[in-house]
C-alpha cells in the first residue's frame, strides 16, 4: 500500500522550542514533512501548526499518539478535503517584457491571482489556492519563464462550526 497525504492541524502552546520538538519527532520516525505552516491563533498563548506529510495510516497513528505525549501539544486534528478548507500562497516572478506582458496578465487573471509588482522585464504574481490550482498556474506561466517562486505551507481550517477548539 502506498502512502497517502495527510494534513494535521496541531494546536500547541506558543513557547520557544515547540516547533523544534514537533519537527524532531517526525524526523526521528523517518517522515518527510511536505508542508509546514505555523502561526498565531485567536488565543495569544497558542499557535496552530498545519503539517502535511505522506504516510500510511498505521505509522501516522503512531506519530499522532507520540505528538499527543509532547507537553506543549494541546490537540491534534486530521483535516480532510470534505470537512476542511485549505489554501497555500505563492509568489511567482515571471519573465514578462513589453511584448508578453499582456499575455501573462491574461493568464494570471484566469486564475484570479494578482500582479503585485512590475518591472521592465518581469511581473511578480500573488496567487492563493489549493495545491492543484497553484500547480496549474505554474504550468501556464512556465512557457513565459519563471524566474523565482516562494511558496508558503498549507493552512487549513475545519468547515462550519467544527474546529480544533482554540477559543478559551
Swiss-Prot record:
Instruction: Explain what induces or represses this protein's expression.
Output: The expression gradually decreases as growth progresses.
KW Oxidoreductase (keyword) present: no
Crosslinked positions (Isoglutamyl lysine isopeptide (Lys-Gln) (interchain with Q-Cter in protein Pup))? 44
Extract the GO molecular function terms from the UniProt entry: acetolactate synthase activity; acetolactate synthase regulator activity
* GO cellular component assignments: cytosol; peptidoglycan-based cell wall; plasma membrane
Task: Cite the ACT domain residue spans from the record.
Answer: 7-82
Alphabetically sorted, this entry's keywords are: Amino-acid biosynthesis, Branched-chain amino acid biosynthesis, Isopeptide bond, Transferase, Ubl conjugation
Q: What class of enzyme is it?
A: transferase
Instruction: Give the reactions, separated by semicolons, that this protein catalyses.
Output: 2 pyruvate + H(+) = (2S)-2-acetolactate + CO2
Q: Which GO terms describe its biological process?
A: isoleucine biosynthetic process; L-valine biosynthetic process
Write down a Pfam family by its short name.
Answer: ALS_ss_C
Establish whether keyword Ligase is in the entry: no
Superkingdom in the source lineage: Bacteria
Q: What is its EC number?
A: 2.2.1.6
Pathway this chain belongs to? Amino-acid biosynthesis; L-isoleucine biosynthesis; L-isoleucine from 2-oxobutanoate: step 1/4; Amino-acid biosynthesis; L-valine biosynthesis; L-valine from pyruvate: step 1/4
Q: What does this protein do?
A: Catalyzes the conversion of 2 pyruvate molecules into acetolactate in the first common step of the biosynthetic pathway of the branched-amino acids such as leucine, isoleucine, and valine.
Q: Which PANTHER family match?
A: ACETOLACTATE SYNTHASE SMALL SUBUNIT, ACETOLACTATE SYNTHASE SMALL SUBUNIT 1, CHLOROPLASTIC
Q: Assembly and interactions?
A: Dimer of large and small chains.
Which protein family is named in the record? Belongs to the acetolactate synthase small subunit family.
**What name is this protein filed under?**
Putative acetolactate synthase small subunit
Species assigned in the record = Mycobacterium tuberculosis (strain ATCC 25618 / H37Rv)
Q: Which gene encodes it?
A: ilvH
Amino acid at each position: 500500500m502506498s502512502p497517502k497525504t495527510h494534513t494535521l492541524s496541531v494546536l500547541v502552546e506558543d513557547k520557544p522550542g515547540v516547533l523544534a520538538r514537533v519537527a524532531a519527532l517526525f524526523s526521528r520516525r523517518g517522515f518527510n514533512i511536505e508542508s509546514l505552516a505555523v502561526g498565531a491563533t485567536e488565543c495569544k498563548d497558542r499557535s496552530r501548526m498545519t503539517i502535511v506529510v505522506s504516510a500510511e495510516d498505521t505509522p501516522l497513528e503512531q506519530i499522532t499518539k507520540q505528538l499527543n505525549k509532547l507537553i506543549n501539544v494541546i490537540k491534534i486534528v486530521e483535516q480532510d478535503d470534505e470537512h476542511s478548507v485549505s489554501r497555500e500562497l505563492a509568489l511567482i516572478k515571471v519573465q514578462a517584457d513589453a511584448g508578453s506582458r499582456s499575455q501573462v496578465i491574461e493568464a494570471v487573471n484566469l486564475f484570479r491571482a494578482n500582479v503585485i509588482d512590475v518591472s521592465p522585464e518581469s511581473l511578480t504574481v500573488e496567487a492563493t489556492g489549493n495545491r492543484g490550482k497553484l500547480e496549474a498556474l505554474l504550468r501556464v506561466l512556465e512557457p513565459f519563464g519563471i524566474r523565482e517562486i516562494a511558496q508558503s505551507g498549507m493552512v487549513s481550517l475545519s468547515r462550519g462550526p467544527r474546529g480544533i477548539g482554540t477559543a478559551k
